Amino acid sequence: MHIHDWPTHERPREKLLARGATALSDAELLAIFVGSGLRGQDAVQTARDLLHRHGPLRLLLDRPAKTLARLPGLGPASACKLAAAMELAQRHLMSALERGEALSDPPSVGRYFSQRLRARAYEVFAALFLDNRHRAIAFEELFTGTIDGADIHPREVVRRALLHNAAAVIVGHNHPSGNPEPSEADRAVTKRLLDSLELVDIRLLDHFVIGDGRPVSFAERGWLE
């Protein structure tokens, strides 16, 4: 049965308009991008198959657009729409940070770091530089490494913060293993970074560790006091 033959209130697009995007399942949201679906299937069933074979949703959406375009049921047009939607989500979060919402909504900062770093196959350490009203000035990837780690140099973080005339910094890095639990090395380098920034009167507001699931926040655990 084609989706157009479904009751109106069950169709993904109509359901979204009537009840909001949160009312849709992962498959229903993905079906909006899939379009007509594969031959003999409606778009929702095609979306379910994509999630079953290439999911869960996070792993599917973390793929580059060129990879998505090769998956049965998507193709170049749908892959481009998905990639554009992901980029819009990142820019939306960044615009919120630029308006000074970095401290009023810490989970959004964690989500932003997660979107930027989670899919990397190697460790990346990044910094979000903030002005004295905690508005985002710039986001920079400062250090890259291997699947096992990256060398972090606090002096370079301080240098970049001074270059941006930042009053505060939030940093984050990913764990390619998927386990977001901070290591002893993570805690040690964060202490060095905290001390180095304090010497030039710049605050380290948080350090997020990105893996599968929810990012781990050093500030939330009281490790920056």
UniProtKB/Swiss-Prot annotation:
<dbReference type="InterPro" id="IPR001405">
    <property type="entry name" value="UPF0758"/>
</dbReference>
<feature type="domain" description="MPN">
    <location>
        <begin position="102"/>
        <end position="224"/>
    </location>
</feature>
<dbReference type="InterPro" id="IPR010994">
    <property type="entry name" value="RuvA_2-like"/>
</dbReference>
<feature type="binding site">
    <location>
        <position position="175"/>
    </location>
    <ligand>
        <name>Zn(2+)</name>
    </ligand>
</feature>
<feature type="binding site">
    <location>
        <position position="173"/>
    </location>
    <ligand>
        <name>Zn(2+)</name>
    </ligand>
</feature>
<dbReference type="InterPro" id="IPR037518">
    <property type="entry name" value="MPN"/>
</dbReference>
<comment type="similarity">
    <text>Belongs to the UPF0758 family.</text>
</comment>
<dbReference type="Pfam" id="PF20582">
    <property type="entry name" value="UPF0758_N"/>
</dbReference>
<dbReference type="GO" id="GO:0006508">
    <property type="term" value="P:proteolysis"/>
</dbReference>
<protein>
    <recommendedName>
        <fullName>UPF0758 protein XCV4028</fullName>
    </recommendedName>
</protein>
<dbReference type="Pfam" id="PF04002">
    <property type="entry name" value="RadC"/>
</dbReference>
<dbReference type="InterPro" id="IPR046778">
    <property type="entry name" value="UPF0758_N"/>
</dbReference>
<dbReference type="InterPro" id="IPR025657">
    <property type="entry name" value="RadC_JAB"/>
</dbReference>
<keyword id="KW-0479">Metal-binding</keyword>
<dbReference type="GO" id="GO:0008237">
    <property type="term" value="F:metallopeptidase activity"/>
</dbReference>
<dbReference type="GO" id="GO:0046872">
    <property type="term" value="F:metal ion binding"/>
</dbReference>
<dbReference type="InterPro" id="IPR020891">
    <property type="entry name" value="UPF0758_CS"/>
</dbReference>
<keyword id="KW-0378">Hydrolase</keyword>
<keyword id="KW-0645">Protease</keyword>
<keyword id="KW-0482">Metalloprotease</keyword>
<keyword id="KW-0862">Zinc</keyword>
<feature type="binding site">
    <location>
        <position position="186"/>
    </location>
    <ligand>
        <name>Zn(2+)</name>
    </ligand>
</feature>
<feature type="short sequence motif" description="JAMM motif">
    <location>
        <begin position="173"/>
        <end position="186"/>
    </location>
</feature>
